[in-house]
């Protein structure tokens, strides 16, 4: 069976299979995932949920952190500048209307983040997993008297953010390159800790939240944005040829449930919780794919430089990755896989 799947994937990666057929296959695999994880079987679902929860509690903070860098950031920043929106926001954006464009959707999302995290000028704000600085730079612009400390595991991203900060005259940004497993920061130093789509690369939230609790001031808050499933949580593992996403784009990652954090409140207490429909990510990923296709002429030489003889296959893999994100989060009109926002306060001693 694995041989048949392998040959089918090679055909799909050749670019000969129409996008419509690829999207249909992705929807079928999404349904298969729901069945495997016990979405429609209460007994199986509860057991699977607890098995994963116990695994998380006995894991290190994050695994395969170097692999995540390789899989997403070996392409030069120029690729993401051509594919993402103006802010280089590599995460779900917010589309209040059908006519909303990607650049505008980025701005809507960032403003929502600020409101929900209760950000104010003059605060010391830590961003964990800052990407190319979409939120870090936005906060630095919006709150000139705030001090922004951003953490990324990518030296390339650090260079990009500092270059942009210098260009725009932003003097209130510090960027740290570090693996979250070994990250150590000053205690009681931050008014806010914010994170956008980084906690999906985390396994042991108890250990991470303990660290964050120590970094926050007494009245400090943690706010985070994650993608998640409404009921299920599961790790991305490479067990068979079916596990294409785990192999090429999300090794060591986790699909949290909207309830996963509820089990990790020893150090931080959940104060508020919001959800977005998965259709916002569907629209985001489709916009990225549209930009990639539109800029194919300028981007394909980048792929040839990075991937050499495998350039054509990797071009299609990135296209499939964006289609997979769009179809997964658009599944059942965005009511299965969704976006979660969480606000935590320090637990009373």
Give the label of every model feature segment.
Residues 121-131:
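Conserved class I S-adenosyl-L-methionine
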Residues 132-144:
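Conserved SAM-binding loop of SAM-dependent methyltransferases across substrates and taxa
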């Amino acid at each position: 069976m694995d041989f048949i799947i392998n040959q089918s994937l090679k055909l799909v990666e050749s670019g000969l299979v129409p996008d419509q057929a690829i999207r249909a296959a992705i929807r079928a695999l999404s349904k298969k995932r729901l069945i495997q994880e016990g979405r429609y079987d209460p007994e199986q679902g509860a057991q699977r949920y607890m098995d994963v929860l116990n695994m998380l509690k006995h894991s290190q903070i994050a695994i395969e952190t170097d692999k995540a860098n390789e899989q997403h950031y070996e392409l030069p920043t120029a690729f993401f500048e051509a594919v993402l929106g103006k802010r280089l926001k590599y995460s779900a954006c917010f589309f209040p209307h059908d006519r909303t464009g990607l650049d505008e959707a980025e701005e809507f999302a960032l403003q929502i983040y600020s409101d929900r995290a209760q950000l104010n000028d003059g605060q010391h704000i830590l961003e964990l997993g800052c990407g190319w600085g979409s939120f870090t730079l936005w906060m630095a612009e919006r709150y000139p008297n705030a001090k922004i400390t951003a953490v990324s595991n990518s030296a390339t991203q650090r260079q990009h953010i500092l270059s942009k900060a210098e260009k725009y005259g932003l003097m209130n940004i510090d960027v740290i390159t570090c693996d979250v497993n070994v990250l150590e920061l000053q205690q009681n130093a931050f008014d806010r800790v914010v994170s956008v789509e980084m906690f999906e690369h985390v396994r042991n939230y108890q250990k991470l939240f303990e660290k964050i609790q120590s970094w926050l001031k007494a009245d400090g808050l943690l706010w985070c944005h994650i993608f998640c499933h409404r009921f299920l949580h599961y790790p991305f593992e490479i067990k068979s040829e079916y596990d294409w996403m785990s192999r090429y784009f999300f090794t060591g990652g986790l699909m949290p449930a909207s309830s996963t954090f509820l089990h990790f409140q020893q150090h931080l207490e959940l104060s508020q919780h919001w959800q977005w429909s998965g259709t916002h990510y569907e629209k985001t990923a489709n916009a990225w794919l549209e930009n990639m296709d539109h800029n194919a002429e300028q981007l394909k030489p980048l792929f040839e430089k990075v991937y050499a003889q495998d350039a054509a296959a990797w071009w299609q893999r990135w296209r499939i990755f964006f289609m997979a994100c769009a179809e997964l989060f658009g599944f059942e009109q965005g009511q299965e896989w969704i976006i979660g926002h969480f606000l935590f306060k320090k637990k009373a001693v």
